[in-house]
Amino acid sequence: MRFCPKCGSFLKVKGNKMVCSKCGYSDHDVEKVILKENVAHENDKTIIADGETIEGRVAISLCPRCGSVRAILLNKKKRLYRCMTCNFVYNI
């Protein structure tokens, strides 16, 4: 989360820059920004991977190993995911 150096408001990402909606300040240094957004999860699904049954919700989460955005939410409280492409288990 980044804040405007002029007025202290939250900076929003617009295209390839960050913009303050209050005073209009813009910053082109967005390569360090990680965007997260809430996604409505699909209904629970059962997935079979490598002969192992995995139950969970299909979610959009970036896998740190292969870069895929499809994952199974294994544990919501611990934010534990399993990548649907490479089966890597990670948390965010």
From Swiss-Prot:
Induction: At least 4-fold induced following infection by Sulfolobus turreted icosahedral virus 1 (STIV-1) in strain 2-2-12. Undetected in non-infected cells. Induced following STIV-1 infection, protein is detectable by 12 hours post-infection (p.i.) and increases until at least 24 hours p.i. in strain 2-2-12 (at protein level). Disulfide bonds: none annotated. It comes from the Archaea. GO terms for molecular function: DNA-directed RNA polymerase activity; metal ion binding. The keyword ATP-binding does not apply. Its cofactor is Zn(2+). Gene3D superfamilies: 2.20.70.10. Changing residue 77 to A: Very small decrease in RNAP activity. The active site is at 76, 77, 78. Residues 55-92 are annotated as: ZR-C. One of its GO terms (biological process) is DNA-templated transcription. Zn(2+) 1 binds at residues 4, 7, 20, 23. Keywords: Antiviral defense, DNA-directed RNA polymerase, Metal-binding, Repressor, Transcription, Transcription regulation, Zinc. Zn(2+) 2 binds at residues 63, 66, 83, 86. Residues 1-31 are annotated as: ZR-N. The keyword Transcription regulation applies. Residues 32-56 are annotated as: Flexible linker. Interacts with RNA polymerase. NCBIfam families: TransFacS4. Strain 2-2-12 is a substrain of P2 that is highly susceptible to infection by Sulfolobus turreted icosahedral virus 1 (STIV-1). Belongs to the archaeal RpoM/eukaryotic RPA12/RPB9/RPC11 RNA polymerase family. A potent inhibitor of RNA polymerase (RNAP) probably involved in viral defense. Destabilizes the transcription pre-initiation complex of TBP, TFB, DNA and RNAP, inhibits abortive transcription initiation, productive initiation and transcription elongation. Increases the RNAP KM for NTPs about 50-fold. Overexpression of TFS1-tip4 (TFS1 with the active tip of this protein, phenocopies this protein) in S.acidocaldarius MW001 leads to severe growth inhibition. This is Transcription factor S4. It comes from Saccharolobus solfataricus (strain ATCC 35092 / DSM 1617 / JCM 11322 / P2).
